[in-house]
């Protein structure tokens, strides 16, 4: 068990956690350690606990966070905690200041970079220009605790990807394209 497991290690603490972080009553959660993630099906939302505690993620998920995940074809498991901090910090700025920022505005300031654990992080393109400041340098050891979220957790207007993708170029495999390519090469 990781450091944040103590927040949800009993039924009473789960009820308290759900109440404190504003989970709807028809949403159910349970704790899963990093080693048990392989047994989880991709129909349930799985989030590191730190994304809720420090990253500002709430259920149902903010539309801007879902748009970010869809844009980059990422599941929440593929993002390090700082991604949630930056995206949710930007979403809060938009809500508080009435801004209409897009994912493209965000990628003007940040770039998505792959980490060593096949996860992705956001890195500022210019050290002096950031949307969200005061982020910790590392969340090492704090992303080992996960919540499996079931029930009515989805945003009613837009849904988030749950199956991990690999970023990069995908091969176009339409049969007509392959046929035309073969003719072109001869």
Model-derived features with residue positions:
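Residue-register detector that marks a fixed positional context within folded domains
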Residues: 1-186
